[in-house]
Amino acid sequence: MVLERTLSIIKPDAVAKNVIGDIYSRFEKAGLKVVAAKYKQLSRREAEGFYAVHRDRPFFNALVEFMISGPVMIQVLESENAVARHRELLGATNPKDAALGTIRADFAESIEANAAHGSDSVENAAIEVAYFFAATEIILR
Protein backbone atom coordinates (compact mmCIF):
# COMPACT_ATOMS: atom_id res chain seq x y z
CA MET A 1 0.00 0.00 0.00
CA VAL A 2 1.50 3.31 -1.14
CA LEU A 3 0.16 6.33 0.69
CA GLU A 4 -0.03 9.72 -0.97
CA ARG A 5 -0.51 13.16 0.49
CA THR A 6 -2.40 16.03 -1.06
CA LEU A 7 -3.00 19.63 -0.11
CA SER A 8 -6.56 20.79 0.35
CA ILE A 9 -7.69 24.35 0.99
CA ILE A 10 -11.23 25.16 2.00
CA LYS A 11 -11.58 28.60 0.43
CA PRO A 12 -13.09 31.78 1.94
CA ASP A 13 -16.54 31.23 0.38
CA ALA A 14 -16.97 27.81 1.98
CA VAL A 15 -15.49 28.95 5.31
CA ALA A 16 -18.02 31.82 5.35
CA LYS A 17 -20.84 29.30 4.83
CA ASN A 18 -19.66 27.41 7.93
CA VAL A 19 -19.30 24.09 6.09
CA ILE A 20 -15.79 23.11 7.19
CA GLY A 21 -17.18 20.25 9.29
CA ASP A 22 -19.38 19.01 6.43
CA ILE A 23 -16.37 18.96 4.11
CA TYR A 24 -14.14 17.23 6.67
CA SER A 25 -16.84 14.58 7.12
CA ARG A 26 -16.72 13.88 3.39
CA PHE A 27 -12.93 13.57 3.50
CA GLU A 28 -13.07 11.08 6.34
CA LYS A 29 -15.92 9.03 4.83
CA ALA A 30 -13.83 8.71 1.65
CA GLY A 31 -10.88 7.37 3.65
CA LEU A 32 -8.79 10.55 3.56
CA LYS A 33 -7.03 11.18 6.87
CA VAL A 34 -6.26 14.72 8.00
CA VAL A 35 -2.59 14.63 9.04
CA ALA A 36 -2.04 18.41 9.34
CA ALA A 37 -4.36 21.41 9.42
CA LYS A 38 -4.34 25.14 10.02
CA TYR A 39 -6.98 27.84 9.97
CA LYS A 40 -5.54 31.11 8.76
CA GLN A 41 -5.94 34.37 6.94
CA LEU A 42 -3.60 34.32 3.94
CA SER A 43 -1.50 37.40 3.35
CA ARG A 44 -1.27 38.81 -0.17
CA ARG A 45 2.32 37.60 -0.31
CA GLU A 46 1.33 34.03 0.66
CA ALA A 47 -1.50 33.92 -1.89
CA GLU A 48 0.67 35.35 -4.67
CA GLY A 49 3.44 32.89 -3.86
CA PHE A 50 1.13 29.90 -3.70
CA TYR A 51 -0.54 30.73 -7.01
CA ALA A 52 2.66 32.02 -8.69
CA VAL A 53 2.26 29.44 -11.46
CA HIS A 54 -0.80 31.45 -12.59
CA ARG A 55 0.91 34.87 -12.38
CA ASP A 56 0.62 35.54 -16.13
CA ARG A 57 -2.98 34.34 -16.41
CA PRO A 58 -5.77 36.93 -16.68
CA PHE A 59 -7.51 35.64 -13.54
CA PHE A 60 -4.44 35.85 -11.26
CA ASN A 61 -5.25 39.14 -9.51
CA ALA A 62 -8.89 38.20 -8.93
CA LEU A 63 -7.80 34.81 -7.55
CA VAL A 64 -5.38 36.43 -5.11
CA GLU A 65 -8.01 38.99 -4.01
CA PHE A 66 -10.51 36.20 -3.42
CA MET A 67 -8.05 34.04 -1.47
CA ILE A 68 -7.23 36.93 0.89
CA SER A 69 -10.87 38.01 1.27
CA GLY A 70 -11.41 35.82 4.33
CA PRO A 71 -9.92 32.98 6.33
CA VAL A 72 -9.14 29.59 4.80
CA MET A 73 -8.77 26.10 6.25
CA ILE A 74 -5.67 24.36 4.93
CA GLN A 75 -5.12 20.65 5.42
CA VAL A 76 -2.88 17.81 4.34
CA LEU A 77 -4.84 14.68 3.50
CA GLU A 78 -3.35 11.20 3.33
CA SER A 79 -4.55 7.92 1.81
CA GLU A 80 -3.94 5.61 -1.09
CA ASN A 81 -4.49 7.65 -4.26
CA ALA A 82 -5.09 10.76 -2.14
CA VAL A 83 -4.73 13.23 -5.02
CA ALA A 84 -7.28 11.50 -7.26
CA ARG A 85 -9.61 10.65 -4.38
CA HIS A 86 -9.64 14.27 -3.17
CA ARG A 87 -10.17 15.68 -6.67
CA GLU A 88 -13.07 13.28 -7.21
CA LEU A 89 -14.70 14.54 -4.00
CA LEU A 90 -14.19 18.15 -5.10
CA GLY A 91 -15.76 17.75 -8.53
CA ALA A 92 -15.13 19.88 -11.60
CA THR A 93 -13.47 23.28 -11.12
CA ASN A 94 -16.62 24.97 -12.42
CA PRO A 95 -19.43 24.01 -10.03
CA LYS A 96 -21.90 24.13 -12.94
CA ASP A 97 -20.03 21.15 -14.39
CA ALA A 98 -19.52 19.34 -11.08
CA ALA A 99 -21.33 16.07 -10.50
CA LEU A 100 -24.16 16.07 -7.97
CA GLY A 101 -22.96 15.27 -4.49
CA THR A 102 -19.47 16.69 -4.97
CA ILE A 103 -18.13 19.43 -2.72
CA ARG A 104 -18.21 22.04 -5.46
CA ALA A 105 -21.70 21.11 -6.64
CA ASP A 106 -22.98 21.34 -3.08
CA PHE A 107 -21.06 24.32 -1.68
CA ALA A 108 -19.50 26.43 -4.47
CA GLU A 109 -20.97 29.61 -5.89
CA SER A 110 -18.99 30.08 -9.10
CA ILE A 111 -15.83 29.07 -10.91
CA GLU A 112 -14.05 31.82 -8.96
CA ALA A 113 -15.60 31.02 -5.57
CA ASN A 114 -15.44 27.25 -5.98
CA ALA A 115 -15.21 26.19 -2.32
CA ALA A 116 -11.90 24.34 -2.33
CA HIS A 117 -8.47 23.84 -3.84
CA GLY A 118 -6.90 20.45 -4.41
CA SER A 119 -3.45 19.52 -5.66
CA ASP A 120 -3.54 18.34 -9.28
CA SER A 121 -0.66 15.83 -9.11
CA VAL A 122 1.46 13.97 -6.59
CA GLU A 123 4.44 16.13 -7.58
CA ASN A 124 2.55 19.40 -7.09
CA ALA A 125 1.05 18.09 -3.85
CA ALA A 126 4.54 17.71 -2.38
CA ILE A 127 5.41 21.29 -3.36
CA GLU A 128 2.10 22.68 -2.07
CA VAL A 129 2.26 20.78 1.23
CA ALA A 130 5.79 22.11 1.83
CA TYR A 131 4.60 25.66 1.05
CA PHE A 132 2.27 25.67 4.06
CA PHE A 133 3.59 22.98 6.42
CA ALA A 134 6.94 22.06 7.93
CA ALA A 135 7.59 18.31 8.09
CA THR A 136 7.28 18.52 11.88
CA GLU A 137 3.68 19.76 11.55
CA ILE A 138 2.53 16.61 9.77
CA ILE A 139 1.43 13.98 12.27
CA LEU A 140 1.06 10.36 11.18
CA ARG A 141 -2.20 8.67 12.11
From Swiss-Prot:
Q: Which cofactor does it need?
A: Mg(2+)
Residues annotated for ATP binding in this entry: 11, 59, 87, 93, 104, 114
Catalyzed reactions: a 2'-deoxyribonucleoside 5'-diphosphate + ATP = a 2'-deoxyribonucleoside 5'-triphosphate + ADP; a ribonucleoside 5'-diphosphate + ATP = a ribonucleoside 5'-triphosphate + ADP
Superkingdom as given in the UniProt entry: Bacteria
Q: What is its EC number?
A: 2.7.4.6
Q: Where in the cell does this protein reside? A: Cytoplasm
Catalytic center residues: 117 (pros-phosphohistidine intermediate)
| Family to which the UniProt record says this protein belongs | Belongs to the NDK family.
Entry protein name: Nucleoside diphosphate kinase
* Species annotation: Xylella fastidiosa (strain 9a5c)
